[in-house]
Design a protein with these regions (language model features):
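C-terminal membrane-cytosol helix-exit motif in multi-pass small-molecule transporters
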Residues: 133, 152-172
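Cytoplasmic membrane-interface "Motif A"-like loop-to-helix N-cap segments
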Residues: 49-61
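Hydrophobic core of transmembrane alpha-helices in multi-pass small-molecule transporters
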Residues: 67, 78-94
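Intracellular juxtamembrane helix-capping segments at the cytosolic ends
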Residues: 93-106
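Helix-loop boundary and gating motifs at the non-cytosolic
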Residues: 1-38
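C-terminal ends and interior cores of transmembrane alpha-helices
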Residues: 62-75
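Glycine-rich segments within core transmembrane alpha-helices of 12-TM secondary carriers
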Residues: 113-131
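Transmembrane alpha-helix termini and helix-breaking/packing motifs in multi-pass membrane transporters
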Residues: 18-19, 42-50, 127-148
């Protein structure tokens, strides 16, 4: 997830100014809309009434990746607002469920160590994303469309691979659905 999200975030301000002629007002609205799904992440508990956590997490990753891949195809104010909200829904729901699953599946004694390693992997993914942007745009000549498609496509492929590789883990804690 850090790879896909980091590409989206790193390219966003330049993309919206160059392709959609955003001013500070539109960028401010875009960033505000990006946070709306974060405020609504509590609604995950309602989704969990009908969808298992693992599937919900993978579905959220898929939604985020598709939102990133669609970004360059809607270089208008409302198009970018829409793709940003789609991407952000996936991002915030995944972050919410990811913490829950980690705490369920990892032994309590190993949790701090595991979460530290996970943060290190996220940071490495972000650094890989930033260096890839520079390399591919500066040296290979990729444009915004290619970069967003590549990042979103990689996210989709990784998510589908995870879906196949890990069909279903048993739930570590029984979730009460009352």
């Amino acid at each position: 997830m850090p790879l896909t999200f980091s590409v989206w975030q790193a390219l966003l301000n330049n993309f919206v100014v160059e392709r959609a002629a955003f001013t500070g007002a539109e960028i401010g609205m875009l960033q505000s809309l990006r946070e709306v799904p974060g405020f609504l992440a509590f609604t995950a508990v309602f989704v969990l009434l009908v969808v298992r956590e693992q599937r919900f997490a993978l579905g959220s990753l898929l939604v985020m990746s598709v939102g990133v891949a669609l970004t360059p195809f809607f270089p208008s104010t409302y198009g970018l607002y829409a793709t940003t909200v789609v991407m952000s829904m996936g991002f915030h729901y995944f972050e919410t469920i990811n913490k829950s699953l980690t705490l369920q599946w990892i032994e309590k004694t190993q949790t701090p160590h595991f979460m530290g390693k996970a943060m290190a992997v996220k940071a490495a993914g972000a650094l890989l994303a930033y260096s890839s942007i520079w390399l591919l745009m500066e040296w290979v000549g990729f444009g915004f469309t290619a970069m967003y498609l590549l990042a979103g496509g990689i996210g989709v492929v990784i998510t589908l691979a995870l879906w196949v590789a890990f069909p279903h883990f048993p739930e570590g804690a029984v979730q009460h659905k009352k």
